[in-house]
Each structure stands twice: as structure tokens, then as C-alpha cells.
Amino acid sequence: MTSKIIVALDYEKEAEALALVDQIDPSLCRLKVGKEMFTTLGINFVKQLHQRNFDVFLDLKYHDIPNTVARAVRSAADLGVWMVDLHASGGLRMMEEAKKILEPYGKDAPLLIAVTVLTSMEDLDLLQIGINASPMEQVLRLAHLTQRAGLDGVVCSPQEVEILRNTCGKEFKLVTPGIRPIGTDFGDQRRVMTPTAAIRAGSDYLVIGRPITQADNPAEVLRSINVSIG
């Protein structure tokens, strides 16, 4: 699997999600399962995606006391997901314990990444929760904390990719939502970029939802994006 595209499955019903999944090629993308779908459909839905040969990014953004998060991450590893995430704002100890609990899994451990600043958040949003910093400043602070904890990478907006690549190195994975091909609606994302521009900036993986899932021909859109990013 070499594709850099992660298709975000944001559906209310299993049948609708699987109808989309059955139209696309697992060699051309991975799939992201978030809070809504996982809460509704649970681990059996993830298993169905695995049976269709898709790698799964379990996007539950864990944020709790260290022991609780570590155990949740272990459960994700037992499920066999490819990637799982947590909130870097949970702190260094929380992230370190989550990383440590994956050690027995060796090469079969999922990638463990941290969410820095949600791509819907702007300066005012941060100020309202007591953070007197720009999104960029907060992303850098949390990315460095994530790297110190030994995690594999972070979720960040495309605009932060270049500086994170320069400061965190080539091996640190950068996963970027807020990806919108030219001509598509921005939706509720505020810090966005096209797939080609994001890859050029240094993104490792692009999270793309509605431009693919709501397309008349999802398979063709997916193929086209893969071609555009090489």
C-alpha cells in the first residue's frame, strides 16, 4: 500500500458506507472511521472494512487520564487498525503511556499519532479556551511534545506541514485533513489546501471526505487525485 489518501467515512448508516466502500479500490486509499460511525456501528464495522482489504485509521481522538487512553490504544491495536490517534493536549505522560503499551506489538503496532489543533479552529477559538497563541504556535508546541513522547506523527492542517517537516524531520508522519480539490466546497474546514499543494508541502497522508464520498463517481475522483499527486 503506497497511496497517500485516507478517505473519511462520514455516514450515519452502515449500508451507505459500505456502498461507497465497495466502489473504491483498497490499493488506492485507506479508510478513516471516526466517532460517529464507530459509536453507531462499533468494531464489527471495522472488521468488515478489514475483510475488504482496507487499512483503517481509527480516528477517535482519545483524551483522558493516561491509563484509560493507554488501554483504549491497546484495544485499537488488538482490533488490527493501521493508525489510531489521541489529543496531544492530553499531555506528555498520557502520550508516553499510550506509546509504551504498544511495545509488545512490535512491527504490528498501529501508527500512533496526535491531534494538535483541530482544522476548524482559528485564533478566536483558541483564545476562548484560554490559549493565547495562534493556531500555528500551538501546533508547533504540541507537535514538539508529541515527538518528545515518541509518537509517530501528528494530525495538522496543510498550512503547518512545511514548518513541521523542517522542525520535526523526515520520519515524523504528517496527516492532513482540510484537503479540498480545486472547485469543491470547504465545508466546516477553515485551513484548507489542494491535494497537490499539500503533498508538495510535505504531507505524508491526506484525509479527504466529501469530495470523494459525495462525488457522482467516487472511484474516478479517487483515481484522479492519486494521479494528481503522483
Swiss-Prot record:
Pathway: Pyrimidine metabolism; UMP biosynthesis via de novo pathway; UMP from orotate: step 2/2
InterPro entries membership: Aldolase_TIM (IPR013785), OMPdecase (IPR014732), OMPdecase_AS (IPR018089), OMPdecase_bac (IPR047596), OMPdeCOase_dom (IPR001754), RibuloseP-bd_barrel (IPR011060)
GO cellular component: cytosol
Keyword Membrane (UniProt): no
Keywords: Decarboxylase, Lyase, Pyrimidine biosynthesis
Xref: PROSITE patterns: OMPDECASE
Origin superkingdom: Bacteria
Single biological process term from Gene Ontology: 'de novo' UMP biosynthetic process
Reactions catalysed, as given in the entry: orotidine 5'-phosphate + H(+) = UMP + CO2
Catalytic residues, chain numbering: 61 (proton donor)
Family annotation (Pfam families): OMPdecase
Residues the entry annotates as binding substrate: 10, 32, 59-68, 119, 180, 189, 209-210
Gene Ontology molecular functions: orotidine-5'-phosphate decarboxylase activity
EC number(s) on file: 4.1.1.23
Function: Catalyzes the decarboxylation of orotidine 5'-monophosphate (OMP) to uridine 5'-monophosphate (UMP).
Assembly with partners or alone: Homodimer.
Similarity remark: Belongs to the OMP decarboxylase family. Type 1 subfamily.
Name this protein carries in UniProt: Orotidine 5'-phosphate decarboxylase
Source lineage: Bacteria, Pseudomonadati, Pseudomonadota, Gammaproteobacteria, Pasteurellales
